[in-house]
Amino acid sequence: MIFLNTFARCLLTCFVLCSGTARSSDTNDTTPASAKHLQTTSLLTCMDNSQLTASFFDVKFYPDNNTVIFDIDATTTLNGNVTVKAELLTYGLKVLDKTFDLCSLGQVSLCPLSAGRIDVMSTQVIESSITKQFPGIAYTIPDLDAQVRVVAYAQNDTEFETPLACVQAILSNGKTVQTKYAAWPIAAISGVGVLTSGFVSVIGYSATAAHIASNSISLFIYFQNLAITAMMGVSRVPPIAAAWTQNFQWSMGIINTNFMQKIFDWYVQATNGVSNVVVANKDVLSISVQKRAISMASSSDYNFDTILDDSNLYTTSEKDPSNYSAKILVLRGIERVAYLANIELSNFFLTGIVFFLFFLFVVVVSLIFFKALLEVLTRARILKETSNFFQYRKNWGSIIKGTLFRLSIIAFPQVSLLAIWEFTQVNSPAIVVDAVVILLIITGLLVYGTIRVFIKGRESLRLYKNPAYLLYSDTYFLNKFGFLYVQFKADKFWWLLPLLSYAFLRSLFVAVLQNQGKAQAMIIFVIELAYFVCLCWIRPYLDKRTNVFNIAIHLVNLINAFFFLFFSNLFKQPAVVSSVMAVILFVLNAVFALFLLLFTIVTCTLALLHRNPDVRYQPMKDDRVSFIPKIQNDFDGKNKNDSELFELRKAVMDTNENEEEKMFRDDTFGKNLNANTNTARLFDDETSSSSFKQNSSPFDASEVTEQPVQPTSAVMGTGGSFLSPQYQRASSASRTNLAPNNTSTSSLMKPESSLYLGNSNKSYSHFNNNGSNENARNNNPYL
């Protein structure tokens, strides 16, 4: 009741001013911005043909000095004696309801009222006896969800059946959970997870690196999903939900820097586009950052959704300044996100894409600089040639290629949403071309990588009934494309396609259905539900812990989509339902984000401090380690058990196929030993420096000097012995004599593996314990 009196007095002052009988004076606001206050920045109309409308309405109440400061530009056609009915709605509940006759206030100018224009900037002091009764929590609770509605009736309308005017003001206290002190620590911790993964992989703890990398990427996916969900153009997003989700827009590249915004403005204008000026003029515009429900019963009361679509009073377009300068600008979805980030809508696409490209540039330059630093330290003999960084020095080129795929899959939701949305905006011809190019490049990289993974996996299934054999035995392929599939079980490598499809569909519908909030919310909920059910059913990730981690993330995503389904007002539920859901959304996501961040911090700390963090993880059940070329050390006579285990693994692989398939494979691979090296290949990486295809031959291991055999991969070791100067090849004659008579070229290639040696029945039979699965596991960051 207290603030109702304050608000009513402000409105009454407006009526007095337009009648010409009241005093008004321009006032300089000397109250600090951080002082306790309540404010409203727009006056919304909540009925057809309202006789009071406002194109600008800015009112602030400061309890410390009991002062109301207002700046109003409105028009009224009210005449005669009027009765006012005022309501205070807090979190969807009607907590106060007051009715009074303007004539009872004793102001001649208010009884009767006169039509006219209201254009005033002034102040008014409220009695302290009134302001002291207002609850103090209203000034401190973040993202206050409260609004005041005032309906005017003719004095003789005692039944309140025919309202003359209906206006509504959204209240705020300036406190919010949207803060850089939440956004940037979250971003920093997420980045630390990825950096820690790279570091521990270099020093040899591959299992730890794989799990940290997988969890870090899942963390990014969660943050991106939350940011994308917040971009849906639903009917009503309560303040606390809108503010909290704004903290994660950095994951979409939505980061405001003044100098870059100036560059983007210039670029838009220089390429025959028109820059938006809403943010630059927000102090003189009346803006509602989202549609608001206005009733405890339902948002359909007073036809509020229909009124906001009234083009005579409201506009949702930022492209016509002459339009929104005389009307109330209603922002929702991506428009709201851009406004809350203080980014002009015309710069939204460029902001997200440029920050992604900048991050990509920094990562690539850092990798090159690190390579140069290692070379300098090695040449200065500060770093040993055989240090843990040798594999990076030798394979830094392929590491950069793998990094491009890694960043592409992380940025795919961001790039696809921003590019497709830009197609609907056409801010300038050049920006549209930029959107096409960047979308084609990122999509092309992922499509290429996905096709390569599917070809390799299907070939391995056809030859060995096990996709892990070729996916993990070809170290060059693993190093380049491994990030696309190593987080999944070997037989679930195909889950890469559902994951990319899920990300693309979400981005597509959020981008193109900005003006269809109800349909958009329903489609996104169905997509989330379908993906969550499939994820729980198939459980494609590499182990139980990672599956639980990802299922929990997508469960929260599903709940968020469910909440936004209600925010779209599809069910016309009471406003209190949406308000309570918003509070639950904030608490749920805040607690869950805190858990994920603490989990990342603890995992990274243990990885850096634990003497051997790999012991915390169980071996992969798909036995992928067995198919990776092992490290062969000097023979010391302690190799009996290991050689028997090797022969057993080879025998197991042989029993996976029938006799006809085995003969076909033996004959085919034997042909390949003497095949022309110029055989055409579909892809350029079918032959690599790490491959054994043209160097494998059926000679006994005792015929050559024992040498360490290490795969040339940044994730597998320090290089194969066949590349070293001391490597002794079998003579050409020996290989020719042992090869089959039929030397025709075959399209099939020999898998890079120490388990198969062509047509010979002989195999390497001398291994010691240092060449066991543990060595391979410690030199592969994906395991």
UniProtKB/Swiss-Prot annotation:
GO terms for cellular component: cytoplasm; endoplasmic reticulum; endoplasmic reticulum membrane; membrane. It is found in: Endoplasmic reticulum membrane. InterPro entries: TRP_C, TRP_Flc/Pkd2-like, TRP_N. Residues 1-22 form the signal peptide. Keywords: Endoplasmic reticulum, Glycoprotein, Membrane, Signal, Transmembrane, Transmembrane helix, Transport. The keyword Glycosyltransferase does not apply. May be responsible for the transport of FAD into the endoplasmic reticulum lumen, where it is required for oxidative protein folding. PANTHER family: FLAVIN CARRIER PROTEIN 2 (PTHR31145:SF2), INTEGRAL MEMBRANE PROTEIN (AFU_ORTHOLOGUE AFUA_7G01610) (PTHR31145). Present with 414 molecules/cell in log phase SD medium. This is Flavin carrier protein 2. It comes from Saccharomyces cerevisiae (strain ATCC 204508 / S288c) (Baker's yeast).
